[in-house]
From Swiss-Prot:
Organism: Klebsiella pneumoniae subsp. pneumoniae (strain ATCC 700721 / MGH 78578)
Described function: May act as a double-stranded DNA (dsDNA) mimic. Probably regulates the activity of a dsDNA-binding protein.
Protein family according to the UniProt entry: Belongs to the putative dsDNA mimic protein family.
Protein name stated in the entry: Putative double-stranded DNA mimic protein KPN78578_21580
NCBIfam families named among the record's database cross-references: PRK05094.1
InterPro entries for this protein: dsDNA_mimic_put (IPR007376), Put_dsDNA_mimic_sf (IPR036763)
Domain of life, source organism: Bacteria
Gene3D superfamilies linked to this entry: dsDNA mimic, putative
Length: 109
């Protein structure tokens, strides 16, 4: 895969794209009770955090997860406003290179 460092999504664009994908697919992949909980609590305790891809993605995908081009976005709820997300609804692996639309999601079970 040939990728260009100058053609990447910004961190904000990456977070926004991951969250949009999450919202689009959540109804098909989460329990209805989880969707209700997320929607009720997101305003106060919800968030999306950007990370380098964790090593356990290698169990799910078969390409090099160079952190220059791939990001992991964790979407969920924290115990407090501004706290660390500890109630995870989805982990989204996203390619930040604009010409390579790769996305993989691990949903809450």
């Amino acid at each position: 895969m040939d990728m260009d460092l100058n053609n990447r999504l910004t961190e904000d664009e990456t977070l926004e794209q991951a969250y949009d994908i999450f919202l689009e697919l959540a109804a098909d992949n989460l329990d209805p009770a989880d969707i209700i909980l997320f929607n009720l609590q997101f305003e106060e305790r919800g968030g999306a955090e950007l990370f380098d891809p964790s090593a356990d993605w290698e169990e799910h995908v078969d390409y090099d997860l160079n952190p220059d081009f791939f990001a992991e976005v964790v979407i969920g709820l924290a115990d407090t406003d501004g706290g660390e997300i500890n109630d995870i609804f989805a982990r989204v692996l996203l390619c930040r290179e604009k010409d390579h639309k790769l996305c993989h999601i691990l949903w809450r079970e």
